[in-house]
Amino acid sequence: MEDPLLLGDDQLITRNLKSTPTWWMNFTAELKNVSSMAAPMATVTVSQYLLPVISVMVAGHCGELQLSGVTLATAFANVSGFGIMYGLVGALETLCGQAYGAKQYTKIGTYTFSAIVSNVPIVVLISILWFYMDKLFVSLGQDPDISKVAGSYAVCLIPALLAQAVQQPLTRFLQTQGLVLPLLYCAITTLLFHIPVCLILVYAFGLGSNGAALAIGLSYWFNVLILALYVRFSSACEKTRGFVSDDFVLSVKQFFQYGIPSAAMTTIEWSLFELLILSSGLLPNPKLETSVLSICLTTSSLHCVIPMGIGAAGSTRISNELGAGNPEVARLAVFAGIFLWFLEATICSTLLFTCKNIFGYAFSNSKEVVDYVTELSSLLCLSFMVDGFSSVLDGVARGSGWQNIGAWANVVAYYLLGAPVGFFLGFWGHMNGKGLWIGVIVGSTAQGIILAIVTACLSWEEQAAKARERIVGRTLE
């Protein structure tokens, strides 16, 4: 059983808190707490990110048509399905995290169960859309053969989406209690399980690209199984795996109250990146532009898992301490997350900039592509900085419970600022893919600025009071 990360009065030096020596001691302690969670969570996110990527890579060896169809289906499925599942459970980072801090342990199990039940009908609705994905793509002007492969792949992804409806709440159930090592072991085991299963279904069973999609579903359900077994039999979850039926209806209401804006935060951001790739096909020399922007997007997405891990750790620490009534510790968790972001982004940006002349060869042997990637490397380094900052502050929003503000911030940042700037520079400014990527940076920068202003203006004492009212208010009546 892992040690709890909540800081009690005996662990936090409260006397003369604003003095430099005392503040630094508390900050160092909190930095250690956030770091101990951020590293495992980043590894968990990397493992989960690589799982569908491996399926795309294996399916791509079935032929160019299969690669195009699978890539198209994956992009659409991420925005219309998996992104929604990932976003909705952001509500649990608020509710379960603050309930754990407030020692309302049975509510953690109730919130998690209500999330799973609430996710299932949403999966059914999304699945109906996926059944007609091929016809949708054809109506949007996509190649009929590619659309047929994409539609078939999407239908085979439905079991994976249903698994995510269970896996994501279980992940947040453990994360918000600081139980990140079980998540780490399960994620790595699942990734190792997925590789042979994918190869067997695609080649040994002759299922082709559809086998790659089915392998994702099998691997996700395998992860659900081992997570569920841990939750059921581990003594670390003994207090929190309970269920209170009287709180179920209220829990569902609260889940959607925070889950819908949280899902909006995710899908608004993810959809802009997919729109970027689709738009690159309308530029002069679309093959080059699409290839280079796909490389930039892949690199940026892979890097983002690190600040996402920091954001998840920060979210947990903030929600735990607000629920426990420790606003000063929650404030320190914000500073700790920002410090880790700056350190990580500086290292990764410096490394990429140093290798910018050879970086493109990791993806292509074409000198034209490599030279273009080199030209965009400076912008990609800047993306590392601003995207990481936004990811950490997204965690602050989820931990504090102001996802609705975060959703509106994303609308303003990405669709009122980022997208117009990108399209103007890319098409009318004749900067092509470079202009589109500048639009992404503008959107991420605007998002970070808005979230930073909101965070700076927060009254943490008020946030702690809201957390207590949110979690235990009904109990105290």
UniProtKB/Swiss-Prot annotation:
UniProt xrefs under CDD domains: MATE_eukaryotic (cd13132)
Keyword Metal-binding: no
Major localization listed first in the record, in broad terms: membrane
Record keyword Transmembrane present: yes
InterPro entries cross-referenced by the UniProt entry: MATE_euk, MATE_fam
Biological process (GO), any one: xenobiotic detoxification by transmembrane export across the plasma membrane
Molecular functions per Gene Ontology: antiporter activity; xenobiotic transmembrane transporter activity
Annotated transmembrane regions: 38-58, 72-92, 113-133, 146-166, 187-207, 211-231, 263-283, 292-312, 333-353, 376-396, 411-431, 436-456
Entry's localization field: Membrane
Topology class, membrane: Multi-pass membrane protein
Any GO CC annotation of this UniProt entry: membrane
Entry keyword set: Membrane, Transmembrane, Transmembrane helix, Transport
Pfam families: MatE (PF01554)
NCBIfam families, alphabetized: matE (TIGR00797)
Family of the protein in this entry: Belongs to the multi antimicrobial extrusion (MATE) (TC 2.A.66.1) family.
Protein name: Protein DETOXIFICATION 5
Organism: Arabidopsis thaliana
Gene for this chain: DTX5
